């Protein structure tokens, strides 16, 4: 078992980049694989989750070179060129791989099956199997959870689907199925979710319409190979945005970070708490906005986090809770029940961990209350969740004594170079087994 020890530090200073965006990396493989022609992807995240997606397409006959220095070259086979995999597709720990692949595979002429690790096998899949079945797909789960068994050769029909809650994975799953369905597939969102799929469709020259809060797609299009630069992942930058904000004397610059407006909830929340975050040198990598982020220490104050921020910061809440633990006053969050359905129950894991470190935290069914103050040393269990592990590693920098974090191997799913990058800013994080 891989564990971390994170020791208290003085201040954090320096300039870093973070690995490529995980959401965009997954999608670059998917659309590159079903494109006509070759795609060259730079900035690809070679973490375990995205490698699971890459290997899935290799098993379906797509030739993919790399990753080599974050470059991947994909030799697309076109929309109808995928071949039946010889084995069950293992999505390992990646819910994105499983949910997006399910939409694509539901439209193929061959049978397939998707499985994953112990954590993934606990995650809810009815949210995709039900609308796919409405489209005419034959998709079965085990009591609403993986593995997913898909019978190919089914004729899909477009539907108008009103999203019951914000979920980029469900939306993307249905858009991928809609690329093969008879008639239009229309998806209406009542709350904003990540729009990387819609942007990626445009990057690969596939027609998609956005009208009155709905996304419309049909099968009358093809993806075409392209060149793509992937920006740094704001979900990975989040750990260092918070770290610099809560560690006195800190001054950190993070270059080339994606600032897609459906992902910048952490900047809005921390700014409301009093953080000193400057967004510099704004530009674009294709369809995705990018900037450099300059963060300096500032005393934070507790706030009531608006529920409207939940889909815009869903993956960043564990480390936002660390910021709240260092803020003056109380921080509350409601409307975030989805956090209990991630790689772990992130509300439960953070409440337990914060209490272990002397911070008063209470969990609700859909949120949390944290009384800010000081973080003590101690030991916490990440529950095998990469974002919990990295969040408590950040806490160690400002704790009164070292923080030991158990069960950290899954950090490799999203940020394999986390410890190296952190220590460049003068963290003192050690790994041990």
From Swiss-Prot:
One of its GO terms (molecular function) is 3-phosphoshikimate 1-carboxyvinyltransferase activity. 3-phosphoshikimate binds at residues 22-23, 27, 167, 169, 315, 342. InterPro entries: Enolpyruvate_Tfrase_dom, Enolpyruvate_Tfrase_sf, EPSP_synthase, EPSP_synthase_CS, RNA3'P_cycl/enolpyr_Trfase_a/b. Phosphoenolpyruvate binds at residues 22, 95, 123, 169, 346, 387. Its main location: cytoplasm. It is found in: Cytoplasm. PROSITE patterns: EPSP_SYNTHASE_2. SUPFAM superfamilies: EPT/RTPC-like. Pathway: Metabolic intermediate biosynthesis; chorismate biosynthesis; chorismate from D-erythrose 4-phosphate and phosphoenolpyruvate: step 6/7. Keywords: Amino-acid biosynthesis, Aromatic amino acid biosynthesis, Cytoplasm, Transferase. GO terms for cellular component: cytoplasm. Monomer. PANTHER family: AROM/DEHYDROQUINATE SYNTHASE, PENTAFUNCTIONAL AROM POLYPEPTIDE. Catalyzes the transfer of the enolpyruvyl moiety of phosphoenolpyruvate (PEP) to the 5-hydroxyl of shikimate-3-phosphate (S3P) to produce enolpyruvyl shikimate-3-phosphate and inorganic phosphate. This is 3-phosphoshikimate 1-carboxyvinyltransferase. The lineage of its organism: Bacteria, Pseudomonadati, Pseudomonadota, Gammaproteobacteria, Legionellales. The gene is aroA.
């Amino acid at each position: 078992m891989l564990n971390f020890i994170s020791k208290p530090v003085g201040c954090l200073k320096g300039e870093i980049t973070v690995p490529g965006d995980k959401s965009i990396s997954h999608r670059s493989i998917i659309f590159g694989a079903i494109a006509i022609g070759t795609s060259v992807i730079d900035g690809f995240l070679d973490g375990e989750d995205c490698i699971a997606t890459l290997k899935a397409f290799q098993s379906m006959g797509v030739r993919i070179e790399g990753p080599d220095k974050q470059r991947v070259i994909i030799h697309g086979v076109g929309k109808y060129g995928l071949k039946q995999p010889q084995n069950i597709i293992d999505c390992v720990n990646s819910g994105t791989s499983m949910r997006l692949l399910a939409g694509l595979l539901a439209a193929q002429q061959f049978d397939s099956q998707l499985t994953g690790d112990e954590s993934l096998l606990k995650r809810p899949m009815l949210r995709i199997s039900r609308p796919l079945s409405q489209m005419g797909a034959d998709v079965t789960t085990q009591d609403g959870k993986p593995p997913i068994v898909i019978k190919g050769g089914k004729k899909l029909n477009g539907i108008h689907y009103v999203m019951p809650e914000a979920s980029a994975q469900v939306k993307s799953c249905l858009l991928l199925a809609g690329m093969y369905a008879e008639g239009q597939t229309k998806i209406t969102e009542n709350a904003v979710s990540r729009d990387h799929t819609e942007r990626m469709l445009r990057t690969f020259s596939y027609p998609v319409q956005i009208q009155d809060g709905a996304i419309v797609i049909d099968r009358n299009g093809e993806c075409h190979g392209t060149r793509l630069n992937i920006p740094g992942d704001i979900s990975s930058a989040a750990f260092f945005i918070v770290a610099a904000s809560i560690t006195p004397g800190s001054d950190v610059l993070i270059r080339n970070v994606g600032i897609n407006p459906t992902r910048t909830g952490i900047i809005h929340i921390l700014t409301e708490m009093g953080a000193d975050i400057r967004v510099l040198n704004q530009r674009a990598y294709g369809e995705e906005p990018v900037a450099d982020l300059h963060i300096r220490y500032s005393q934070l104050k507790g706030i009531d986090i608006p529920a409207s921020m939940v889909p815009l910061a869903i993956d960043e809440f564990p480390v936002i809770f660390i910021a709240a633990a260092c803020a003056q006053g109380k921080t509350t969050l409601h409307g975030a029940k989805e956090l209990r359905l991630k790689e772990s129950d992130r509300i439960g894991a953070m409440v337990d961990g914060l209490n272990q470190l002397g911070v008063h935290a209470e969990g609700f069914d859909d949120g949390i209350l944290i009384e800010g103050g000081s973080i003590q040393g101690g030991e916490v269990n990440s529950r095998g969740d990469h974002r919990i592990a990295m969040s408590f590693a950040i806490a160690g920098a400002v704790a009164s004594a070292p923080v030991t974090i158990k069960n950290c191997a899954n950090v490799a799913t999203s940020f394999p170079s986390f410890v190296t990058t952190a220590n460049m800013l003068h963290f003192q994080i050690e790994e041990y087994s």
